[in-house]
Swiss-Prot record:
Pfam families: COG4_C (PF20662), COG4_m (PF08318), COG4_N (PF20663). This is Conserved oligomeric Golgi complex subunit 4. Disruption phenotype: Zebrafish mutants are significantly shorter than their wild-type counterparts. Mutants have craniofacial defects with a smaller jaw, smaller inner ears, slightly smaller eyes, and stubby pectoral fins. They exhibit malformation of the inner ear, with abnormally shaped semicircular canals. Mechanosensory hair cells in the inner ear and neuromasts have reduced numbers of hair bundles. Response to auditory stimuli is greatly reduced. Animals show defects in proteoglycan secretion and reduced collagen COL1A2 expression in fins, but normal collagen type II expression in the jaw. It comes from the Eukaryota.
Length: 781
């Protein structure tokens, strides 16, 4: 409808009225104006016609909608009636609810005022009861009952009391309040004085009696402080007595080496017993969350007594002087004033034991305080919980006992490192190899020392101490001890008396120089080359075995330490960060194993080059002296009396017999593998220098098979891959015709992977005297 009306609006008048007025048309006189107006009227007529057509087209749709609206009329009337009825019901319900709720509110207000009146009456009665009761209790010296009345008075609603003072009974209330306030002051003074007297005389029943009364008077902090004062006096008395006994104990007693650790343990166990005994009393009478306050007072006394014990320990064990001597030795190298490792052993054990007891004590305190705070903070907000957590950490980490233990461990770590290094040097100097043993004593001794030092650090329950000692152990094994083995292997495997002497002199000079420069103790007498040749050979083989055992021991040590550290972690002794640090240190330790494996490979390569290569090369070269350009008669003779391979096998058997006895099975296997690679390489070079007939190629194939079979029997390594090129050469030398190679080459090779290049194949074919060079050149490989 709007679209139909729009042209009329554009024409500036109502619908159906032209924009050109009749008067205007009558006034026109010019033909051009008439034509223009006529054209305009024609255009308007066309627009009107379009509008009419549109309206006529919408007629059916409009009539349908109107009919639909007419049908909806009765329903709309029904809906209107229902809506009016619903509105009336809602208005009625609203009025009814308003009336009921107003009465309920009035009833609630009345009930509240009634309760307030009852509460006020009860409080006034309680006030009167407390006033009478506290006076009677004080006269009878029943301080518990008097405190209960005062506690009841303090728990009354102060606003109700103020209202009562303003009411008709105001004077009576004021009088009762005055009496109660005076009784409160007197009772607080009396109970505090009696508690101080009981603490001074050490009367435990009276101390506990008045300690239980103070929280009823609102004196929680004072009660805990006075009770802690009594406990501290008892603690100090017992600790001083134990320290006197420790200082005066006989040095021959069984526990004499750890007497100060035992004394510290008694002190800490005493505090633990106090907590276990009196924590229920504190929780019952003072409520949860108060244990931290009591322990804060006790910890101060613990710090004093622990410091006395540690001071006596430092004095009696000459701890600081030992540390200074050790530090001087480690910084300046060898000095005349030197401590024997065995003199440090008992001191180090006692220090770790003391720290272990302190860590156990701190874990005990943490568990008890955390459990106490959890009950108290059940409904507390996050800020209070964080505050309690911070106060706990401050108590445990900033106390004097914690700092003292850190100082002791700070001295312990370099002393333990010194003990480890000196003991390892002694083990190296005292190294002996028993007859029939593959390795010498130094390996077991060194790893016993390393394990002992790290295990002792573990007993301290300090993750930082454990990390430090694992790192020091890694350094000792990786540098000091490995360097000893390197120097022994650097002397080489003697092959003759003259070479042995020359090698020994040169090695002695280099080792003496490195020892002087690095300050390391090495067993030079075993590498000077002055012992017999057989002893030098045995020493070299023993060193190889030592290197292998070291590599295995490091891996075993790492696994054992992981298990020990897991036990330490399961006791809650370390955080996640500490676990990550220890895991990182253990990873560095096990990485040292690969360096020993590399050293073993170097030593075996040296042994292979020195003892095996000079022997094997001439044996393989003897293959040249055996003609392989043979006929039937010679082939039969070779079959009856093998000219090469059997002799070679016997020679190899004799050569490796010494190593089989002197080396571990794993090392012997590896050495055999190196020898196998050498044989394959030298054999290949030698074959290229020979010429073959058809039967000669067959003889070579038999010799190669016998050699491979023997070498496979003496090693668990797979050696066929090393002889793959030689096997393929034997195959080529066995061909009847040159063209037969094409049955094995290229797409006809099947699963066979050729290790020989086309040029090498032609070179092998050229070794056959009966193959023409023209046929070989014509091959397309």
């Amino acid at each position: 409808m709007e679209e139909a009306a729009s042209p009329a609006r554009r024409r500036g008048g109502p619908a159906g009225v032209s924009a050109v007025q009749t008067d205007t048309i009558e006034a026109l006189t010019e033909l051009e104006d008439l034509e223009r107006v006529y054209a305009q009227l024609c255009a308007e007529e066309a627009e009107v016609q379009v509008e009419l057509d549109a309206l006529v087209g919408q007629q059916n749709n409009i009539e349908t909608k109107m009919l639909s609206l007419q049908r909806m009329g009765p329903n709309l009337q029904l809906i209107e009636g229902d809506a009016v009825q619903l509105s009336g019901m809602i208005n009625f319900t609203c009025s009814l609810a308003e009336n009921v709720s107003s009465k309920v509110r009035q009833l609630d207000l009345t009930k509240k005022r009634l309760y307030q009146a009852i509460q006020r009456a009860d409080d006034i009665l309680d006030l009167k009861f407390c006033t009478d009761g506290v006076q009677t209790a004080l006269r009878n010296q029943d301080y518990e009952q008097a405190a209960a009345h005062i506690h009841r008075y303090l728990s009354l609603d102060q606003s109700v009391i103020e209202l009562s003072k303003q009411g008709g009974e105001g004077s009576a209330v004021e009088a009762s309040l005055a009496l109660l306030q005076e009784a409160e002051r007197n009772l607080k003074t009396l109970v505090t004085t009696r508690l101080e007297e009981a603490v001074a005389t050490g009367d435990l029943p009276q101390v506990e009696r008045f300690f239980k009364i103070l929280p009823l008077l609102g004196l929680h902090e004072q009660g805990l402080a006075r009770f802690a004062q009594y406990l501290c006096s008892q603690l100090a008395s017992k600790a001083e007595e134990n320290l006197i006994l420790a200082v005066g104990s006989d040095l021959g007693e069984r526990r004499a080496p750890v007497i100060f650790a035992d004394t510290l343990t008694l002190l800490l166990e005493g505090i633990a017993r106090i907590v276990e005994t009196h924590q229920p009393i504190v929780e019952t009478y003072y409520g949860p969350g108060r244990l931290h306050t009591l322990l804060a007072h006790l910890q101060k006394e613990c710090d004093k007594q622990a410091q006395k014990i540690v001071d006596k320990f430092i004095q009696q064990r000459d701890y600081n002087n030992k540390f200074q001597v050790v530090q001087s030795n480690m910084m300046r190298g060898m000095t005349t004033d030197k401590i024997e490792p065995r003199d440090l052993d008992p001191v180090l054990c006692e220090v770790t034991l003391m720290n272990s007891r302190a860590e156990l004590y701190f874990r005990f305190l943490r568990r008890r305080i955390v459990a106490d705070f959890e009950v108290a903070d059940a409904m507390a907000d996050e800020a209070v919980i964080q505050e309690h957590q911070q106060s706990l950490e401050q108590l445990l980490k900033n106390c004097q006992l914690s700092r003292t233990m850190q100082e002791l461990i700070g001295y312990y770590i370099p002393m333990e490192e010194y003990y480890m290094r000196e003991s390892v040097n002694k083990a190296v100097a005292m190294d002996t190899a028993e007859v029939g043993q593959l390795s010498s004593s130094v390996v077991d001794d060194v790893f016993y020392i390393v394990k002992k030092c790290i295990s002792r650090a573990l007993t301290s329950s300090s993750s930082d101490c454990v990390c430090a000692m694992i790192n020091h152990a890694t350094s000792v094994l990786e540098t000091d001890f490995r360097e000893v083995l390197v120097c022994k292997l650097r002397a080489g495997y003697p092959v003759s008396a003259l070479q042995d002497l020359q090698r020994g002199v040169s090695s002695a000079v280099s080792l003496m120089q490195s020892s002087l420069q690095q300050g390391k103790i090495t067993n030079l007498t075993q590498t000077l080359g002055i012992e017999s040749q057989e002893q030098a050979k045995s020493a070299y083989l023993v060193t190889l075995n030592n290197v292998e055992v070291c590599s295995e021991n490091i891996s075993t040590l790492k696994k054992n330490l992981e298990s020990d550290c897991a036990k330490l972690f399961s006791q809650g002794a370390s955080s996640d960060h500490a676990k990550e640090k220890i895991d990182s240190c253990l990873s560095d330790l096990v990485n040292t194993s690969s360096k020993f494996k590399d050293l073993l490979q170097e030593g075996l390569q040296e042994l292979n080059n020195t003892a095996i290569r000079p022997q094997v090369k001439p044996w393989i070269s003897s293959f040249l002296s055996v003609s392989h350009n043979i006929e039937e008669e010679e082939f039969s003779e070779y079959e009856a009396n093998d000219p090469f391979v059997q002799q070679l096998i016997v020679q190899l058997e004799q050569l490796m017999a010494e190593f089989k006895v002197g080396l571990s099975p794993v090392i012997y296997d590896t050495l055999t593998s190196l020898m196998t690679s050498l044989i394959a390489m030298e054999m290949e070079k030698t074959v290229f220098k020979c010429t073959f007939s058809r039967l000669g190629g067959l003889q070579f194939d038999k010799e190669l098979r016998a050699l491979v079979a023997y070498l496979s029997s003496v090693t668990s390594w797979t050696i066929r891959d090393k002889f793959a090129r030689l096997t393929q050469m034997a195959t080529i030398l066995n061909l009847e015709r040159v063209s037969e190679i094409l049955d094995y080459w290229g797409p006809n090779s099947g699963p066979l992977t050729w290790r020989l290049t086309p040029a090498e194949v032609r070179q092998v074919l050229a070794l056959r005297v009966d193959f023409r060079s023209e046929d070989i050149k014509r091959l397309r490989l």
